[in-house]
Amino acid sequence: MSLLWQARFFTTVNHLRDLPKTQVPEIAFAGRSNAGKSTAINILCNQKKLAFASKTPGRTQHINYFSIGGAHVGQHRKDETKVDEIRALLVDLPGYGYAEVSGSAKLHWQELLGDYVQRREQLAALVLIVDSRRPFTELDIQMLEWFAPTGKPIHCLLTKSDKLNRNDAANALRTARTILGSYVDENGQPFPFTAQMFSALKRSGLDEANDKIIELLGLNEAPQEESNGPAANDV
């Protein structure tokens, strides 16, 4: 069973000042509205309604946190001592690229997203959700440029790959890797950006995505007291 299956709702925030005071690693999911972000989170966590998936773009307006490990979620928010039991946090960021919301709301969300991905020390990596049928949009590129200076990893899920034939899927993946590979640090070294095809409907790419997220969160090894022997991958 994947550790991600342990995910439970933790808290929701609308301002950076309200971000949880936890010190565990976080991995954030970002993407254009209706690119399949909430669906990807739900399928990875083996839950139908963990992340809210709306048919109305821009409906998800807050940063939603889901905890992995620890006691019952309700206790975490009331008893700070319980927070130490959490092993990691999954973060569902508001979708961007919406057209049916006010300009002031867009500005607030853009500032919230930019500040969070650039300044949150606990953020270990970003999972960027991109519809495989469409190239990287201007806002996808903006997210890359916000996050790249941190030097932290990005893993791109090219969703809805079941809608593409084999050649189109290969081209989409090649294009994504070319775009991601164009980002280099001051020494000319590429940033740790990776990409894969993904389909929630067909459950393809699920194991690859799960393993990558676990790796990025540093959860490859079980806590010492829970380890009863070598992991399946080690034998």
Curated annotation (Swiss-Prot):
A Pfam family name for this chain? MMR_HSR1
Which BP terms does GO give this entry?
Answer: division septum assembly
Alphabetic keyword roster: Cell cycle, Cell division, GTP-binding, Magnesium, Metal-binding, Nucleotide-binding, Septation
Which cysteines share a disulfide bond? Answer: none
This protein's source sits in the domain of life called Bacteria
Looking up CDD domains in the UniProt record yields: YihA_EngB
Presence of keyword Zinc: no
| GO cellular component terms listed in the entry, alphabetical order | cytosol
Domain called EngB-type G: residue spans: 23-219
Binding positions for Mg(2+) per the UniProt entry: 38, 60
Q: Which GO terms describe its molecular function?
A: GTP binding; metal ion binding
What is its biological role? Necessary for normal cell division and for the maintenance of normal septation.
Q: Which family does it belong to?
A: Belongs to the TRAFAC class TrmE-Era-EngA-EngB-Septin-like GTPase superfamily. EngB GTPase family.
HAMAP family in the record: GTPase_EngB
PANTHER family per UniProt: ENGB-TYPE G DOMAIN-CONTAINING PROTEIN, MSS1/TRME-RELATED GTP-BINDING PROTEIN
Q: What is this protein called?
A: Probable GTP-binding protein EngB
The species is Janthinobacterium sp. (strain Marseille)
Q: Which gene underlies this protein?
A: engB
